[in-house]
Amino acid sequence: MATHGAMLTQDVVGGKWYELFTSMFLHFGIDHLASNMIVLIAVGLPLENLLGSGRYAVIYLVSGLAGNVLSAAAELKTGDFAVSAGASGAVLGLMGAVIYCLIRHRGRVGGLSLRRVFLAVFLTLYMGFTNSGVNNAAHIGGLICGFVLAVLFYHPKECRSQHDRQTGWIR
């Protein structure tokens, strides 16, 4: 994995900054990929519906990068280096964004509820902290970044009307 674009903090510091990006698109097996994609579908589709494709993509990519930057910073501080890959920082960023949108909508958007999303985030973080080999810093960094970006990007009337114009939907 390290030779195919997974993130090694030592390499990033040495000039391979692109690993902060490429590692988001690599996974350590089908289970790793599937777990990220299931959450991506469950949370991502309703979020894209609210924000539109452009804002959604920005939140996904920037949250993934922010998670990887926090991960690299944590590794540099602790000296505990590991190969890192996966979309979970970006996916947790989407969950952070959905949390903000749900707060703005009093806890419900489509089939999502604030309680269920909080439970999913809690279980994800709990499993990460109780198992080895999980990049908790990337999860937390992505989650926080996604929430902050949603605060900046999500303006319900503007987002809905822009999305409606793009898709031709009338609500």
Spans of features found by a protein language model:
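A detector for small-residue-rich transmembrane helices and their helix-helix packing motifs
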Residues: 1-171
